[in-house]
Design a protein with these regions (language model features):
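ATP/NTP phosphate-donor binding region
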Residues: 1-79, 287
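Accessory alpha-helical/coil subdomains and C-terminal extensions
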Residues: 6-11, 15-19, 23, 35-46, ...
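Short Gly/Thr/Asp-enriched flexible loops that form oxyanion-binding sites at enzyme active sites
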Residues: 90-112, 248-253, 261-268, 298
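Short, acidic/small-residue loops that bind anionic groups at enzyme active sites
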Residues: 100-131, 138-144, 272-283
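Internal gly/pro-rich beta-alpha loop/helix module
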Residues: 116-186
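ATP/nucleoside-binding phosphotransfer catalytic cores, i.e., glycine-rich phosphate-binding loops
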Residues: 253-351
Length: 351
């Protein structure tokens, strides 16, 4: 390798946070133990095309991740942004889509790539997807059009606001929801589909509001549970059926205090909507999104109570966007106004 070639290698910061990729098997099951340096040692080939540096930010099972951890990741990237050409975050798969969505709002318009990856099998296993995923992440980072927050997994590059874990064990664990892949990586080659990239300087945000709840609707659900959600949160996402709606027939099988009095969802929603709570409707159906205008159970609700609607957004992105918006804009009117503003291709279809 010539001196000139070595001089133009891109500098990539690898941030290790734990997850399956760094886990070792013990008596109680898999636990993250490997360090960032140990992870990098399994993919020595990346040093041929970039200059990697490692940092161990945390070493946790991603099930345990929380808002404070997301802010630590943002802070580390912000402090090192001008020193590196890209970032690779090693992360557990279980909450990877949430982290990708949150970082997409905390770090906006980044002309540099911020890649999140992991694996379904630990990297020190004889048969594993970890080495390929980690190597592919570095390859994407140094590619010409790489930018923004992306998940790299099983040869697919997925925008951070569009990723969802759709398989619990298979190597092709993540899908891009209602949006095409950013790129495909095959045999070490990056085939870029999306050649747009952020211009100028990125915008960093340093706050999240965790008073956002997600209520998953089930047939015959107790409205009192939704009441409790509103008591604890400033914004509530209702993950409903199909295109979106709420049971409108009387009690939904529930009586208030055993008196036999009707206690349906509508009185609960009306009460808290008047108190300024943010209400968002999304769907449990993975693909094609919501449309509350289709059925009476959705249309009446939207017109009467001013529900926001996720449309083609993922629930992970809706949750992350509300956490970001509530931290920046305390007035419900501002949150509602900005909810439909596209950030990192999170939403394409609106009213």
């Amino acid at each position: 390798m010539s001196k000139n070639t070595a001089e133009i290698k891109k500098k990539i910061l690898m941030i290790a946070t734990g997850g399956t990729i760094a886990s070792k098997k013990g008596a109680d099951g898999l636990t993250p133990e490997l360090t960032s340096e140990e992870l990098l040692s399994f993919v020595p080939e990346v040093k041929e095309f970039c200059e990697p540096t490692c940092v161990q930010l945390m070493n946790i099972d991603s099930t345990n991740i929380c808002a404070d951890d997301w802010l630590k990741i943002e802070n580390l990237i912000e402090k090192n942004y001008d020193l590196y050409d890209g970032f690779v975050i090693c992360h557990g798969t279980d909450t990877m889509a949430y982290t990708a969505a949150v970082l997409s709002y905390l770090i906006q318009n980044s002309p540099k790539p911020i890649v999140i990856t992991g694996s379904q099998k630990p990297i020190d296993m004889e048969v594993t997807d970890a080495k390929t995923n980690l190597s592919d992440s570095f390859r994407f980072c140094v590619s010409k059009f790489a930018s923004g927050v992306q998940i790299v997994f099983d040869g697919k590059v997925i925008k951070g606001t569009r990723a969802k874990k759709t398989r619990s064990k298979s190597y092709n664990a993540f899908s891009s929801i209602n949006y095409p892949y950013t790129a495909i990586i095959q045999d070490g080659r990056v085939m870029q589909y999306d050649k747009t990239r952020g211009r100028g300087k990125p915008k960093f945000y340093r706050k999240l509001d965790t008073k956002v709840g997600l209520f998953k609707l089930i047939p015959g659900a107790n409205p009192l549970i939704l009441e409790r959600y509103f008591e604890l949160h400033d914004a509530v996402i209702i993950e409903s059926f199909g295109t979106g709606g709420i049971p409108s027939d009387g009690t939904s099988g529930i009586t208030s205090g055993g008196t036999g009095d009707n206690f349906g969802f509508y009185p609960v929603i009306e009460k808290w909507q008047k108190k300024g709570k943010i209400l968002v409707m999304c769907t449990q159906v993975v693909n094609e999104g919501s449309d509350m205008t289709v059925y009476k159970v959705g249309k009446n609700l939207k017109e009467k109570y001013g529900f926001l609607e996720s449309y083609d957004m993922t629930p992970e992105a809706v949750l992350a966007k509300l956490m970001w918006l509530l931290a920046e804009k305390k007035r419900p009117s501002d949150v509602k106004r900005l909810f439909y503003k596209t950030v990192s291709e999170d939403i394409l279809y609106t009213e």
